[in-house]
């Protein structure tokens, strides 16, 4: 579908419906995995609905009022952001729902971004609308239970460009499924919600996307992909509208749509893979700093130092910095939480710092 850019009036309407309930995140005061646990306590205990009730939810949560604006099902596996869709489904016509299918365009069903087999189809995960999207049945079947990933040489491609093939990033080389760029951030935030909402259970589940812990929850390779997608594809009006509709439906919210900055506050920034040998011994001190200044000690001469805010904004970038016997100093830093990214010999590492 041809994308419709929101007018100032329509954006004001979207914003008016996007107000977070007063006080909803008042207890989200920490950082790191402490913040993640605080969010878990906020969003747990939602009003779990039946699996079949998802089709009722989709009538308000997943209608296309953002591309062709025709009210059909907005399916991330078939949507064509810059042109006409190959097929559409009605949110209210039961005959558009699967049953049997053989080809794309036959019917749509309910896609668990975290596969049901991971949690043995148990409630409330099996019907949690925040991670279950209406998608074409054929594409959903091709995605199967594979993790999401980066696919350079697909063995199968959907009509909108979603790809199935071997993952090409370091850490996992098995089959993976890659959605189109338009919806990568959406997928990332759904899955970050999932591992937060089910923090009390996720350590017991096995899948290539998970690492059997309750804190980080995600495998290192997959965490890096989700953080990259989150940064590259910011929260959209479609996600805001969906978050509000699901809040009405089941009584909890996706915090990473309401507060995208929480992602970096919990999991940090996406890091380049294969990047730590030359900088293994780098230290940043004092941390926290009470003097608006930090020092960096590195055995390797640094090629670049970048200071990044928690929402990904580059505050300072120093190329070929001057050090004194391996010590580099950043001064006059404003109060806040930051990431310091240091590069040397085509490698990089990142540290979180606090300026009081």
Show where each model-derived region lies.
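Domain-level detector of nuclease and nuclease-like folds
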Residues: 98-109, 113-270
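N-terminal module-boundary/linker segments of secreted carbohydrate-active enzymes
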Residues: 18-84
């Amino acid at each position: 579908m041809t994308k419709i850019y929101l007018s100032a009036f329509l954006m004001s309407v979207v914003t008016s419906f996007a107000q977070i309930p007063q006080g909803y995140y008042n207890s989200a005061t920490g950082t790191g995995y402490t913040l993640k646990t605080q969010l878990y306590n906020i969003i747990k205990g939602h009003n779990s609905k039946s699996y079949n009730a998802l089709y009722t939810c989709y009538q308000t949560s997943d209608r296309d009022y953002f591309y062709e604006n025709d009210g059909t099902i907005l399916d991330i596996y078939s949507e064509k952001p810059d042109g006409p869709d190959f097929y559409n489904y009605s949110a209210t016509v039961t005959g558009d729902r699967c049953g049997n299918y053989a080809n794309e365009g036959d019917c749509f069903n309910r896609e668990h971004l975290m596969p049901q087999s991971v949690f043995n189809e148990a409630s409330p995960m099996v019907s949690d609308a925040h991670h279950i999207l209406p998608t074409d049945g054929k594409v959903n079947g091709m995605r199967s239970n594979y993790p999401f990933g980066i696919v350079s040489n697909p063995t199968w491609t959907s009509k909108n460009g979603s790809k199935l093939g071997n993952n090409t990033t370091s850490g996992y080389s098995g089959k993976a499924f890659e959605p189109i760029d338009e919806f990568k951030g959406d997928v990332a935030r759904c899955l970050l919600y999932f591992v937060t909402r089910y923090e009390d259970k996720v350590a017991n589940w096995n899948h290539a996307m998970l690492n059997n812990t309750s804190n980080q929850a995600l495998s290192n390779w997959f965490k890096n992909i989700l953080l990259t997608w989150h940064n590259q594809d910011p929260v959209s009006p479609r996600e805001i509208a969906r978050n509000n509709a699901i809040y009405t439906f089941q009584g909890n919210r996706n915090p990473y749509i309401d507060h995208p900055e929480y992602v970096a506050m919990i999991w940090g920034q996406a890091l380049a893979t294969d990047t730590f040998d030359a900088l293994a011994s780098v230290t940043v001190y004092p941390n926290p700093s009470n003097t608006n200044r930090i020092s960096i000690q590195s055995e390797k001469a640094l090629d670049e130092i970048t200071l990044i805010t928690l929402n990904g904004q580059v505050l300072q970038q120093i190329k070929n910095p001057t050090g004194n016997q391996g010590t580099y100093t950043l001064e006059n830093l404003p109060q806040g939480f930051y990431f310091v990214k240091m590069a040397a010999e085509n490698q990089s590492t990142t540290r979180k710092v606090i300026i009081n």
